[in-house]
Amino acid sequence: MSNPQSGTIGCHCGICEITVADKRAVQYFRCGCEDCRQGIEWGSSRKITKPNICTVKPDQLPHVYYIPADIISIKGKEFMSAYKLREDGRSIRLYCKQCWSLIAVEHPAYQSNVFYILPKHCVTSCDLSVPLTAILFMKDYPEDYETPPEDDVPLFYSFEYKQERQRFSSLPTVANTFKRRTDPLKGINFTELVNSLGEPEILNLERGKRFL
């Protein structure tokens, strides 16, 4: 296997950027969950209040790419801020406070091994050529949206039932992606970056609310 090359993930205004030791995405989902949608829409709605900032129309079914969590440099940390959508939320979202780009997202289930990015809502040089693994959380997909894509991949309505969770865990790349890292880091993991910013701000977003 060739030596990993570094890649960057930053904001649209260019003030914030992280560099990862390995730019190759290891997992790709499309996600219909409410949290992904609200996190994207909330950031995009903040941009609308600033006419000089370019806004992008969110995808109805976001493209979610997982990147190995080994960060070797950070630019503009003072302009980064961490948020949770609700008090009981588990995911932490990292935004640029100047342009409200959504830089990256982490969740305890990732065990600090990976974090995910939404490439339409950040600027990245990472290699996103990994094939689509699955379509997730279609339970939350709004009825007024377009018919979801018909990619020949597993589709999960929710993870409410044990059978669905087991079927998801049995996918070949999933177990590798969401396991604790054993190789030494060249830098710091995403959890360390988020923790260094202090307690995440709780947004208390109303469930079901649309922001765009």
Predicted regions span which residues?
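A short Gly-Trp-Pro
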Residues: S2-I9, C16-L212
